[in-house]
Amino acid sequence: MAKKLISILGLTLILSLSVCACGEEKSFLSATDYELDAETAQTIRGVKIGDDSETFLAAYRDYDILSSINGGDYRFLPVEEIPFTSSLTTILPSFFVDGSAIDLDSFCEENGIEKESLLSFLTDESYLEMHTVLYQYLLFTWENGKITDIRSESMDYNRDGSYYEAN
């Protein structure tokens, strides 16, 4: 079930970020930004359960944030439009190739592929023989303007890529 969720979130990331503003300088989270303190569930940027949108945005406003309102589909919203007081889940996703976060638009352009084909491209056996591919995201659950849960999840496509070939 978790692998299927990660697969869906990966595809959602690809499709949702296609509506992001073009030509803007993008910031990328590093692999260490996805680490959580095991005891406090605090992110490396100091965000923890119980924090509000002000603390969250101070740490993550410059990054791509996908939002799911009341359990709906994840979509990109400008930070000023994210309804933090609703029942909300936000994710900060990244694909890493050979240890570096990738800009999806640039990656697709450089490799001559359509965004809709990115997941197939990244999970292709011949590509995985030459590269390491990791999908990571931080997931924040919100209720009444406060963070109620934080999780860091990932999918190592080199280890688990065969799952995607079958689905």
Residue ranges and their predicted role:
Residues 1-9:
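Bacterial N-terminal signal peptides that target proteins for export
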